[in-house]
Amino acid sequence: MTDLRKLEALQALHAELVAVRQHRFEGLQVLETLLEEQTDAFKALIAKPARDTKDREALGKEPKKLKIGEEEYSLNEDFVNDCLKLADELDLNEKESARILIDCDAEGDVETQSRPLWECGVIRFHQERKYLLDCMRLILEIAADEDIDAGLQESFGVAAEDKIFGIPPPWERNKENQPTQVKKFIPRCMEAMKGVRSMLQCMADKANARNMLQQASLVRPLDNQETLDFSRLSLVEQHECLASILHAAVQRHHATIADFQDFIKILRKWDKYDHFLIHLIPVLAAYITEFGSPEGMGDLQQARRLNDFICKGGDEDSWALPVLGAAVRAWWIAEHNGFYLDDTVQDLRGINLDEEDEQRTKQFLDALKEGAFDFILSVAADCKAQEWQDPSQLGARQWLQRKIPSLPSEPFPFSHFLQHSLMVHLEGFVDATISNLPDVLRKLRTEEDEQRQLRPNHEQDMDLERFLIIISYAYEGRPDAAMSFWEDPDSNLAGFLQWASRRASTPLVSAFCEMLRCLADNEECATAAHNFLLDEGHQASGKMKRSQSLTWSQIFKELEYFTTKVCSERPNPPQASMHRPGRPGADPAEIEPESALMLECYLRLIAKLATESEIARKRLIMDEDFNLVDTILKLSVGVIPHRLRACIFYVLKALMIRKTHEELDAMWRWVEAWMTNPFSSLPGSQGAPQRISFLGQTPGPQECMEMMFREFGTGFEQSNAFIQLLTTLLVPPEGLNSLNDSVPFPEWLGSSIRTLGIEPYVDFVFDVFANRTKDISDPSQLRILRLSCLDFVMVCLVTFNEDLIVLGHESNISIDDAMAATNLATYVRLHPFSRVMEWLFNEKVITSLINTIHQDPISLGSASPDSPLVVSILRAIQVMIKALELQETYLHLVRPEVLRYQGEAGVRRKPVANAAYSAFEDGILSHLSLVVDLGKYCNLGHAELTLACLKLLEKISTSSRILSAWSPDSGRLGHRNKAIVQLERNGEGETISASLSASIMATLDPALAASGENYRVKLAILDFLYACLRATPDQPTIAHQLLGFHCELSKLGIEPKGPFDMQKSLFHSLLNVLITLTVSEEEQGMRGYLVTLKYRVLRILQLLWKSPLSASLVMDELRATNFLFHMLLREVQIQPQLPWDGQLVTGCEFLLSDASLAYIDYLASRAAIFEYIGKELCSVSQNRIPSIKRQIFDALNGQIFVDEEAPLTIPSIFDFFDFINTDYKWEEIPSPHFTYLKDLDLGPCILEHKYAGVHYDIRKAQEILALKRKEYEHSQLATPEFLETVELEEKVLIEWLTVRNRANLLLTARLNLLQAWANLLLVMIESNDFKSTPKMAFLLQALQAILPTLEAFSSLKSDEAFELARVAKVLLWKLDFSQDSDAGLDREQFTVGNLIGDKLFQLFQLCLSAISQCSGTPELRSLYYSICYRYLTAVVDNDATVAATPASSTIGPTRSVTNARARTLKAITLYGDRLLNVICDDAYGSDTTCQTAAMILLNALVHTSRASSAAGVSPADVDCPIIDALNRLNFIGVLVDSLKEILNEWLAPSSTFDPSLSTNASPSLPIPASPSQQYTSAKLALLLQLCQTRQGAKYVLQANLFRALEQSGVFAADPELVEVDSESGVPRVVALERHYALLVALARVVGAAVTARGAHNIVQGRKFLTQHRGLVVHVLKKNAGIGGGVVGNSLASSINGGSTATMTRRDEILAQQALEERIEELAEAFMLLITATGFLEYESEQVPSEQPRAHTTFFH
């Protein structure tokens, strides 16, 4: 850990301490090391090194060098200036400033933060102090944690004493080394706090001075305002941490009386109510408990002396803040009075205890009059987070708080540990006050009652109410502490509750309800509070009757009374204003403020109990004596304040927390009736229900709703509360399945007054969100209101199940009967999803969404993750994501259905105003700043917000609509990607990229593994980059820019001195992750989450190196970083016993666990690595870089050489062939047997995976099962036993689908890896420089590696076998079988050759076996055919050639050749007709490639069979069993018969002409033949081979060879008149050459057939020549040059023949040469036939003899 810099070491220590604080103890050894390294830092606290003139001067001296630790640094002028600036800014030693700046530069803070170096130094300085103090605080917290192991707690206690307080462990103490330093810690801590306050004051003074100069326009605004704001916030946090440490020191008994007195003296001089004062209140409470309470360490005498010091009064007790002094005295007296309640006071002789008691009572009451409770209440309230504070609670506080100014409104939230410690001490204060001062509390109540009676119109003291509110703050959110009020009914606290609830005044009742609400923060406490309010609730054992206590009955009576009162005072209906229903000219002051507050507290208490306690909720809903809902709804339409109406809505919301369907329908009925006719059932109305009227007209239900919405839309409280009520009503009831197959309201809702559904409510929410939020001035209220609206929108979106539409059309389930809604059409029409989506295309709504997201970065930086600001941004982003996901469903399925229904039913709903966009993306395109905002928010440290931002960026970056708008337009030059341009402004892209780099490089917590925030953020970043690159890999995107590339119009570059050039880009961060990542551990094996991380990074790099846009840049950079060798070093071999997240691959649960996903990712990552190595090897071979090429081959052969060191041994390329294990039968997973689900149609949940084929959507499958189960439940067979069996089958089916999916993915990943491995091996085979024996050894090693697997897969797994056979084929063709003589063979090469011969024969047998089984695809069998052909022609024939040479004509070689050939023929014979049958079938019934390969193999088989003749016997005369077999199979007859269509097949246009190809062709064949012509050539070659044997010629002629040729018309057509298809682009000269080539092949077949059988077929040969005399004569003339020049005619025809092909002069010459060669070959073939048949002699005998002419010319 010594290589960590100071801040990074503190951060590492902090992370380990946080883990222990969370009871995770995996890193204790690391923690111990880190803790030991910080010992000196703990002892120094945050003391700053003093300024030193020598150090300052040393920075300016030449040479400018500085030594820090053991390192010496050379300094430039800019660095020195930054050092001096930092030292001046922080009043810090110059050398320490240099150390901080060096750390900043080393850690890349300038790039990460996009700030000047000195500002980064300021931030690092404060971070170091903050982390140091936080670590000290955490150590003290752990030492006080009683929930951890006692031994561990003791160890941390010893560490705290030693390293923080300077007290050595007991075993190290001696008399000379007594803990004297402990006496200095508290003063040092106080001094440090004073220093923090001084720094902050200095900053404030500078800011004020600068503001004055700015106002006078003398200076410009600061550029480093964000840094200053961070410094201020950090200083406040440091002060808070110091206060917490000081608090722990006091609690651990390290304080003295002198320390306490000094502390009180400091408080007496404190003149401002601010954050720093609140930080000290827990310390004050700890001091009081320590020295003034019987629970502390002080004795009574000591406490009495301190009592005189604190409560002495007079001028000596003057306080700059009198209310603070009053609070100190009150707190002290409450605690100190505990000394006088037990027997110890009997030792105080001569003291009048009663007089002292009266004096303390008087002092306490005087303190209250001076504002003690007021101050404590302010501290308790201000310490709580204000952002979520309910306005009602704030109103109660403002009503009681009168003497304390408000806390400065600065963004300095109090930490959770300060809040906790303060509330714990407030709990102690409350307990002490109730237990030690009961008479004082009674006196307070008596005095307040007397004041209310004697002076009802004057302001009364409300200290008792303040005390109750203090209790509420102290216990709010702490249900375990609140149980002390409920556990023991005879306790002081329980007695206080009963006493406070009796005969309470209106203000006291309000405060009591608020206190009771805060004492009900969980179900147990809330139920206890509910029982307390029941008339029959438990009471203290006989001490007090509850007859006059606060009960539910009293609360209900009060509500009924005020409802009647408020509604009876409502003006007459004709005078009511239609604009404000029920409140025409109303003044909220018509209800007394105290009464309104009491009603608010009643309602808040009801809402709390209903929320927390199901018993209370049921009682409130089902109470037969009091209809709560009816009463409060009547109250809501009266003349009441907005805040009271909001409380009513919160009660209704609470009643629906754990609602049932029936309760939900009833609530909707109440709300709908109340909205459409609010005054119909109010008390006081006589006869029929009345409606308000306007200008003599009675408004209808819709007008009433509009008026109510206008009323609720004003202000924050009631609109926010009403929207939250609507949201709760839309949340599905608990206990429902996850189908969301019903609308969240009664389907009949609105049927009598408007269109069905809740469209008016949706419109109201969006109206508030888009329009009325502009009227909210308070930022906190605006955020909360927006969040409430967005929560409503989100619920409407997520509760719509789009899959039901698909399942309804594709599955065999009767979905209308199965789903909860009436039918699918009703569900689609009524669900609020359609209306919400319609609103989301509104311009104002999208603008409000963008405004919600776009916030001040400074405010965001200081906001907590659960603040309204952060949560509202998060929800807005989530809404946008959901809208993009569901947009297609809405546009193509839902909206057409809604419009169709409206057209059929004649219903027309109110259109959405300003629905300007046809797609949601159009709104995003109008706000490009959104991309920048989303990128910036990724660096705030809020994990959920970061994940959402990255997800939305991914959606935006992959949207085809947005991509088409952002991408360059080919019609306009210079139009770059708009998003890239936006990110380039002000360097925003570099800032975002740096923040993403920091997130990528953040350390992972091994204990949290995949659940850690850092890990999830890393994956989100990688997924975003991958999706963006994959969408447009060949165009510059924002992903390229963020990775560090310089994006131009259509290409990428590297900016000089930019992040990429300096290797500080996000791309290099990804590289660093891969290079440093270790995915395996000795004990746990492969860590799945790390494997996944590695694969996600690799696939991004894979896209980059494959894309032409970025390939060259990326390949060069990867080569420069030795990426290839790092990957091979980190690669782990796959072993059967290697665990994957604790699971073995052979385990039965492997495919059901997430370990299988890690295994799949590992295979994919290795495939990517092999792909890269193959690409790199090709690159270095083509670019001729032999040194790197040699290094790569060494690495692939198992050795990496590093400089002059010994080579590192790693697995070789053949060792990495470890992923193929034939024992794993993943593809043979049997299907389970089902009884009830056997006919289930899973077609709708089948997805076509890009690589894995059929893939099941598990979520859709679960939905299908849920629908099927509901279908069963509706039937009569749905017994419990039946449903249990169905549920069991469902579980089995889901598991089987999961296993099937993962097995397919695994097999696909394995196949992809095999392809990559095979491709890499082929590249190695092609590019290696091996010669002779090393080459043979390498090829043998490769052959040995693949043969066992190929043998296992040859007939079972065609895809895997194809890849291996491909390698085997290349290996076979690469083997050099030509040997000049045995004398040139050394012993080693001879041995290798023998081994290869054995392996090749094994390969040959394997292929024969697979062929005979007709295994695999035609492509695979064509490979088998090629391998067999190569073996026969190269191995067997070559051996025969070697044996025939004189130098090798010894007995040994001849015998081996005979054995080899015999062994080969024996193997062929072993498979018999079965083998030949498959080959013959493929020769005619497969694709062209396989046909050709089969024909070629048959040719080789015939040739090999012929070559086995005995010595001295002509091969033509030997019987060939292969030929007999072919004849038995009727193959020869079919072969000959196929010649009838040979001319059409040969001339069929199968490809276009490419002149460039001719340059690579041989002169004899300038144009490559098409696959069909290749097949025809192979077929003719086989015929020729057959006809060269007497046996074969017989079978061919018997098959009517001449008749087939006659019918084909090949020899009957004049080659010069053959038509050429102009569309084929083949020049005529080329077409002629091809035609003549066909004639040559057929003529040779005829000649061989005639000559092979001697005189038997002469007649047929003569007849053939006679029939085609014209062609024969024409060819012979052509060949002799008679009748015109061949070249000239051909050139003219090729130029003027209408061909569209363009040929160069060289191409023309080559084509003419080929044509002439074909003509010459055809002439030779005819002459051979003429000679063999004696055709000329025969002809001469048939005509009369003539006198010979002179100069007779003979044609040859």
Curated annotation (Swiss-Prot):
Write down the InterPro entries for this protein, in alphabetical order: Nup186/Nup192/Nup205 (IPR021827)
Compartment(s): Nucleus, Nuclear pore complex
What main location does UniProt list?
nucleus
Instruction: Return the Pfam families for the record.
Output: Nup192
Which keywords does the record carry?
mRNA transport, Nuclear pore complex, Nucleus, Protein transport, Translocation, Transport
Instruction: Cite the GO molecular-function annotations of the record.
Output: structural constituent of nuclear pore
Q: Name one GO cellular component term.
A: nuclear pore inner ring
Q: Name one GO biological process term.
A: nuclear pore organization
Q: What's this protein's family per the entry?
A: Belongs to the NUP186/NUP192/NUP205 family.
The entry describes its oligomerization and partners as: Component of the nuclear pore complex (NPC). NPC constitutes the exclusive means of nucleocytoplasmic transport. NPCs allow the passive diffusion of ions and small molecules and the active, nuclear transport receptor-mediated bidirectional transport of macromolecules such as proteins, RNAs, ribonucleoparticles (RNPs), and ribosomal subunits across the nuclear envelope. Due to its 8-fold rotational symmetry, all subunits are present with 8 copies or multiples thereof. Part of a tetrameric NUP192-NUP170-NIC96-NUP53 module.
Q: State what this protein does.
A: Functions as a component of the nuclear pore complex (NPC). NPC components, collectively referred to as nucleoporins (NUPs), can play the role of both NPC structural components and of docking or interaction partners for transiently associated nuclear transport factors. NUP192 is located to the NPC core at the nuclear membrane and is essential for de novo assembly of NPCs.
| Name recorded for this polypeptide | Nucleoporin NUP192
Origin organism is Chaetomium thermophilum (strain DSM 1495 / CBS 144.50 / IMI 039719)
Report which gene this protein is encoded by. NUP192
